[in-house]
Amino acid sequence: KVIFDICGKQYEMKKDLDGDWYGVSDPLVVGFHYYFLNVDGVQVVDPASETYFGCCREAGGLEVPEGAEGNYYRPQQGVAHGQVRSVSYYAGSQKQFRRAMVYTPAEYETNTTKRYPVLYLQHGMGEDETGWSKQGMMQHIMDNLIAEGKAEPMIVVMESGDVKKPFVARPGKNVDEERSHYGASFYDVIIKDLIPMVDKTFRTYTDREHRAMAGLSWGGCQTF
């Protein structure tokens, strides 16, 4: 028995004469959706899908496309494209190696004397440092904004907010107090490890006027 699990609903799948499994869901809103398969009671990732870290685990993903209004996050011909690098570094505050995804604008490789402002961009609860560049297509958004003159060329840094596990308050504990500690290890990481590593590795402006932070959902909470 194979179950297709998407957007909080489950749909039983059927096997066709060619041996392929198929199912029909209710209409889905445009945008990106995580999904899972359940095979005889065991939740698995679709082996035919690229995997994405979401909902606190690896998941399949599908995109219900928007019309032309979604062009802002799609790669466009004639637009110079930046790079997203996977950067491993040692975080002394946590005594562990960590990974940051770092976007550099297209001109970074050729304008070798220029320094750049930095945006630290955080993902939502249950996701990781790859969320903005894989699911969110941040690099295409930045490329297009820069090409249109709507954004200054900048470096964008995405790191794990240490919120990969579901938030569960301990019995008898104040929920708001417990929530304030969720992902709190990241605060030491960004101040003591991540920012120093980025400023040492990339051509950045190192003053506070050229450094910003933003985030989605729990990443927004961490920003505040």
Annotated model-derived regions:
Residues 2, 31-39, 102, 114-116, ...:
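Short beta-strand segments enriched for Tyr within beta-sheet-rich domains
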Residues 100-104, 112-126, 156:
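Short beta-strand element of the alpha/beta-hydrolase
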Residues 14-16, 55-112:
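N-terminal cap/lid segment of alpha/beta-hydrolase-fold proteins
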Residues 114-118, 150-155, 207-210:
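Loop/turn elements at helix/coil->beta-strand transitions in domains of secreted/extracellular proteins
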Residues 1-30, 40-65, 92:
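Aromatic-rich carbohydrate-binding modules that target alpha-glucans
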Residues 94-96, 125-203:
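Cap/lid segment of the alpha/beta-hydrolase catalytic domain
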Residues 203-217:
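Alpha/beta-hydrolase fold nucleophile elbow
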Residues 186, 214-222:
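Active-site loop->helix "elbow" adjoining a glycine-rich segment at hydrolase catalytic centers
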